[in-house]
């Protein structure tokens, strides 16, 4: 009987630790700093206009909405060098990212810039977005 009781207690303790670890991981994922890695594929012939829009307008609007620019990249090898822009944003949390994107999309300045920059056709064919957290060994946290 005592052996069964000890076994039951061990199972319950392991389940409790596992549950608590899962809560910690989930809470950290919801509230810890996150990075969003976004890759834009431009419409044919529109990459220069896309770079100009980011350079001249988008970064300032990001800043206004607490969207921290980490880095912007242009591929060096074809064919991606002809149509791709990749960048990384940082947010205090996933919830903050969601809120910032809603505010950004509803910003009258962004809506004006977007409309004007696409007067001769849309600039972006599609966007790929991935949210990530820095690993414990990453130099960038």
Language-model segments: residues:
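Short, surface-exposed ligand-recognition loops at beta-strand->loop->(often short) alpha-helix junctions
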Residues: 42-51
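Active-site-flanking beta-strand signature of metal-NTP-handling nucleotidyl enzymes
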Residues: 35-39, 86
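An amphipathic, aromatic/His-enriched active-site/gating alpha helix that lines ligand/cofactor pockets
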Residues: 4-5, 17-21, 25-31, 52-70, ...
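Short beta-strand-to-coil "C-cap" segments at the C-terminal boundary of structured domains/repeats
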Residues: 10, 132-135
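Soluble, non-membrane globular domain cores that form compact, hydrophobic packing
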Residues: 140-141
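Solvent-exposed loop/turn segments at secondary-structure junctions
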Residues: 45, 75-80, 93-96, 135-137
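Hydrophobic membrane-insertion alpha-helices, especially the h-region
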Residues: 9-16
């Amino acid at each position: 009987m005592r052996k069964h009781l000890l076994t039951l207690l061990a199972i319950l303790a392991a389940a409790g630790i596992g549950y608590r670890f899962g809560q910690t991981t989930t809470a950290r994922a919801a509230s810890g700093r996150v990075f969003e890695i976004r890759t834009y594929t431009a419409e044919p012939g529109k990459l220069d206009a896309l770079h100009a829009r980011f350079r001249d307008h988008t970064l300032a609007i990001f800043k206004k909405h607490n969207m921290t620019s980490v880095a912007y990249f242009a591929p060096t090898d074809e064919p991606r060098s002809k149509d791709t822009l990749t960048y990384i944003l940082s947010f205090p949390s996933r919830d903050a990212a969601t809120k910032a994107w809603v505010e950004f999309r509803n910003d009258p300045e962004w809506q004006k810039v977007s409309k004007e920059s696409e007067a001769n056709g849309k600039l972006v064919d599609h966007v790929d977005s991935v949210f990530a957290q820095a690993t414990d060994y990453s130099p960038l946290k």
